[in-house]
Amino acid sequence: MKSLLLAATILLSTGAFAELAYDRPVTDRIDSGAIEYFIQGKGGATPKGNAACEDGLFYNNHFVALYDGATDKSGKSYDGKKGGRVAEEIIEKVFKSLPPEASKEDVLSRINQSYQDFYTAHPDMDFVKNATWRPTATLIWYSFARRELVAIGDSKARVDGVAINKKSKLVDDLNSELRVRVIKQLKLTEADVAKNDLGRFYILPLLERQSNFQNNPKAPKAFQYWAIDGFEIPAEEILVWRFDRTPKVIELSSDGYEDYPAASNVNAYEEDFAKFLKEDPQRIKNPSTKGLQEGNVSFDDRAVLIYKAR
């Protein structure tokens, strides 16, 4: 895989975000350093798979950001797009228009306003009462002007070799363990699960109910979680890390990658991913709410964005 990835690397010289190139490593530059990224939908390297990919990323001279649209559980679509893709596109559009020194409050305010515009365009749906219908995403970004890393939800980063915000949601942990228990109790093979994941089928009502805890300060504290969905997030739930100087290396990755590799480059991420996928395609050894479905190339979309200072 390493040689193929190296051979397929795209070199850009725009110094600013352009349309995403899927399925192959991309290198680029901004004023302060080098950019490398990779993104692929779980459906694989096809136009349809790329159009459905709910992970996204953005970079320019002022920000690096990565966002992960949540897998839809409602069955709803909007102009042919699932909620996770809608969330990805809303966030990307906002980052393209941000002023260089935008504060975290400004970023979130602009995102929420874009969401409200979207909700207004769909008056037949009550997004306040039915959180399951809300296009949802996690988001993490670094502001070069403010020298701060901001995370909403369980988005993760590694900064100068130190893992940040790797803690998972309790509701996800509980549902992941229950899914695996069902699979083991029914003695399902990996082939069985790939064709018909009865473990996920069993927990799907819980996944739908889980949205009642999303951005809901009235929910039991243990089950609360916070995400981008157009509704307010308490200031104390916005995670912020500040730095005296811009880090030498910033790695942002979605949960399509299980962990951080030894090296800080796309090839290392992809090599670790391939190994993990081979060893545990149905996410049983490392429990998750979903595994590798028949016809897909991964259990989830995946994206990684790496910045290296000059």
Where are these regions (language model features)?
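Classical Sec-dependent N-terminal signal peptides that target proteins to the secretory pathway
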Residues: 1-19
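PP2C/PPM-type serine/threonine phosphatase catalytic domain
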Residues: 19-310
